[in-house]
């Protein structure tokens, strides 16, 4: 009986391999188009793209600031000689929107909140992250905004007050957070660059 198992199992594996390899590869048509208003962007180097609840497209650029595209024109939010001190750093790394419709965005030196009613930008008041690169951020259905830096994870309410700080370690070592995701059950999942998956419920 043991000999039959030794013979049958390799045959099944062989047949499955042949069957999988016999499936013809399908070609997919991919259409690549330029952004309609790309000539209005301050730079061609985009670090992130986000569509808000009103349908506006937001672009985070490398050195060019935050850009809002309404389909006709691009409005740019950045520090320059006309508007000094708007942002500590003009490289926008990530963008999200909270439940009140405010745009949150991270840069290579801190995080900011933009009000869409008057387009006023204010820096997140948390001194801890003002000089750090923000790697990713996500707004969750409970009104919280999760923000990661290179090795730390922070949670804020929609007013910008910090409600949690987490140091994530995988196999005893701190690691860079590379994504934050909320599933349908409102569980927050966090992945790390060199391995590690964490959940908060």
Show where each model-derived region lies.
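Carboxylate-rich, polar loop motifs that coordinate divalent cations or form catalytic acidic clusters
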Residues: 1-201
């Amino acid at each position: 009986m043991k000999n039959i198992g030794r013979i049958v199992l390799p045959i099944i594996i062989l047949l499955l391999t042949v069957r999988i390899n016999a499936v013809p590869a399908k070609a997919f048509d991919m259409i690549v188009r330029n952004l309609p208003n790309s000539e209005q962007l301050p730079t061609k180097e985009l670090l992130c793209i986000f569509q808000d609840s009103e349908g506006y497209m937001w672009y985070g650029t490398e050195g060019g600031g935050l850009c809002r595209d309404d389909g006709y024109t691009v409005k740019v939010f950045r520090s320059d000689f006309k508007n000094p001190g708007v942002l500590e750093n003009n490289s926008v790394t990530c963008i999200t929107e909270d439940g009140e419709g405010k745009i949150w965005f991270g840069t290579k030196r801190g995080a900011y909140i933009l009000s869409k009613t008057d387009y006023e930008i204010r820096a997140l008041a948390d001194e801890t992250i003002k000089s750090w690169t923000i790697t990713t951020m996500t707004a969750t259905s409970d009104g919280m905004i999760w923000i990661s830096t290179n090795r730390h994870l922070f949670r804020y309410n929609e007013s910008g007050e910090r409600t949690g700080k987490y140091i994530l370690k995988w196999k005893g070592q701190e690691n860079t957070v590379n994504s934050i995701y909320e599933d349908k059950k409102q569980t927050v999942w966090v992945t790390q660059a060199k391995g590690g998956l964490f959940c908060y419920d």
